[in-house]
UniProtKB/Swiss-Prot annotation:
Subcellular location as annotated: Nucleus
Signal sequence interval, chain numbering: none
Described purpose of this protein according to its UniProt entry: ATPase which is preferentially stimulated by single-stranded DNA and is involved in homologous recombination repair (HRR). Has a DNA-binding activity which is independent of its ATPase activity.
Biological process according to GO: double-strand break repair via homologous recombination; protein stabilization
Matches recorded under InterPro entries: P-loop_NTPase
Reported impact of D96A: Loss of function in HRR associated with altered ssDNA-stimulated ATPase activity
UniProt entry tagged with the keyword ATP-binding: no
UniProt protein name: ATPase SWSAP1
GO cellular component annotations of the record: nucleus; Shu complex
Oligomeric and partner information: Interacts with ZSWIM7; they form a functional complex involved in homologous recombination repair and stabilize each other. Interacts with RAD51, RAD51B, RAD51C, RAD51D and XRCC3; involved in homologous recombination repair.
Amino acid sequence: MPAAGPPLLLLGTPGSGKTALLFAAALEAAGEGQGPVLFLTRRPLQSMPRGTGTTLDPMRLQKIRFQYPPSTRELFRLLCSAHEAPGPAPSLLLLDGLEEYLAEDPEPQEAAYLIALLLDTAAHFSHRLGPGRDCGLMVALQTQEEAGSGDVLHLALLQRYFPAQCWLQPDAPGPGEHGLRACLEPGGLGPRTEWWVTFRSDGEMMIAPWPTQAGDPSSGKGSSSGGQP
């Protein structure tokens, strides 16, 4: 997962693997020799997400800066003061659980203000990183199978600011394994692509093109054991 690129909105129902993919993106960016990663979430992770493997590189973990703003007000304050933070600028900004912050004040103008702050903060970090280097932005939003009118309004607003979106759908590839189908809409920057993501029993995450896209519809879910795309 690249650290730079257009802002990406990660969408999925509860348990669809949003946090696991955000954490995998953080580990990937932390190992690319770039700046640190800023991971924002409402509360500390209770355990390592799926896909982190049996061993973790301590050097990568040290480059992931976790911040836990407990409310929308505290999140606003953190983002507004980000330009004052000492040290190197992050190469990737992640926010997990956007829906929890939006639920505090469902007014569209508050949601628009929060999104603008996230985009401005990522742009500021990109400026600090220097020419040819950008700070990526990934935001995870939990969706419901039956969305209310407020959820529909929020999603429509978010899609205006995040033309690149990745929809996650959980699925079970086999006993002792967890998997999901990821559909990436790059927002006019390329064709829509679909991927099969498998979390094996040993904790490793495997990614392969969705079988029908790979040109072998008969290959079935077993093809998920292939290598990285």
